[in-house]
Regions:
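Active-site loop/helix belt of alpha/beta enzymes
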Residues: 6, 41-58, 113, 117-118, ...
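Residue-level signal for the nucleotide or nucleotide-sugar donor/cofactor binding architecture
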Residues: 13, 107, 186
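Structured catalytic cores of enzymes that bind and process phosphorylated ligands/cofactors
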Residues: 99, 105-106, 142-145
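Functionally critical, mid-to-C-terminal surface segments that flank or help form catalytic/ligand
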Residues: 252-294
């Protein structure tokens, strides 16, 4: 850190605390349950490469990112464990998925066909995880009551495409971090019933996962073949409604600064934009150099 930077604001990242959180969360899982550590968005601002390397060293089974560029950064930095891309990757970027050995989420048959063609043209096989939308209403093959067999047929067609290997099947909880977990349990029930329907029709996808951070902590029954741990790795609870006594997490990031200016103000003085703070008494006011760019 330069002398000038020391006079402003910085973040300190503790890989020891990251290790504590990983090990604490891992201890909640069955021995054969795989651990996917999320490194999207520069590892939630903590430094994707440093976090990815540490999670691999700790024994994480897989990492997950939002886009293929994030996966490529990890590969260039020496990460070797499997990486799942959770976002939608345009088929024209399929070469990057293959080049960096990235497993791709597929949410519709049309995209799957395009990725399969690209993989065949390269003489390669692309691993995929099939996403089922059971209630988040974002990416994923749409689950709808009465339409399960139609969706199952589309996924069967996807899994039969040469050039693709369907390694995983998953869904994402929308409300597992609320006091009332019944909406998440409804999603879990839909997913399990749909997975059974696929099996009954001869479609075997070996790795099934539902739990995000909140599900991992609060819904042990949802910790299937794997879990996807995101914000909890970094020591942050998914919401104020998640019971903190269940698991002790330690914040991985500390934001630090210096006091750059001190002044005395009198009772009733309005402070800063909009005057949103009114001094309740005569007091000293300290300013720290934290702004948009810090």
């Amino acid at each position: 850190m330069t002398e000038t930077a020391q006079m402003r604001t910085w973040a300190e990242i503790s890989l020891d605390r990251l290790a504590h959180n990983y090990q604490t969360l891992r201890a909640m899982l069955a021995p054969d349950c795989r651990f996917l550590g999320l490194c999207k968005a520069n590892a939630y601002g903590h430094g994707a490469l440093q976090v990815g390397r540490k999670l691999e060293a700790l024994g994480a089974d897989m990492l997950a990112v939002a886009c293929v560029d994030e996966a490529a950064e990890l590969r260039r930095g020496g990460v070797t464990i499997p990486i799942l891309c959770l976002g939608q990757t345009p088929p024209q970027l399929a070469e990057l998925l293959l080049e960096h050995d990235v497993t791709q989420t597929v949410s519709d048959l049309e995209t799957g066909r395009a990725l399969a063609r690209a993989a065949q043209a390269a003489g390669r096989t692309l691993k995929i995880h099939v996403k089922v939308d059971t209630g988040m209403t974002r990416l994923g093959f749409l689950w709808r009551e009465g339409g399960e067999r139609e969706t199952a047929a589309a996924i069967a067609a996807l899994c039969a495409l040469p050039g693709l290997e369907a390694e995983g099947l998953f869904t994402h909880f929308a409300r597992a971090d609320e006091y009332d977990v019944s909406p998440a349990k409804t999603q879990l029930d839909r997913f399990l019933a749909f997975a059974s329907l696929l099996e009954e029709n001869g479609i075997h996808i070996p790795m099934k996962h539902c739990s995000n951070s909140a599900g991992l902590i609060r819904m042990q029954e949802a910790n299937l073949d794997a879990v996807r741990a995101g914000i909890t790795i970094y020591g942050v609870y998914p919401s104020q409604q998640v019971e903190k006594h269940i698991v002790e997490l330690k914040p991985v990031m500390e934001l630090k600064s210096h006091v750059s200016f001190v002044k005395k103000i009198t009772k009733g003085t309005a402070v800063s934009y909009g005057g949103t703070f009114i001094a309740p008494k005569d007091m000293q006011l300290a300013t720290i150099p934290v702004g948009y760019a810090d």
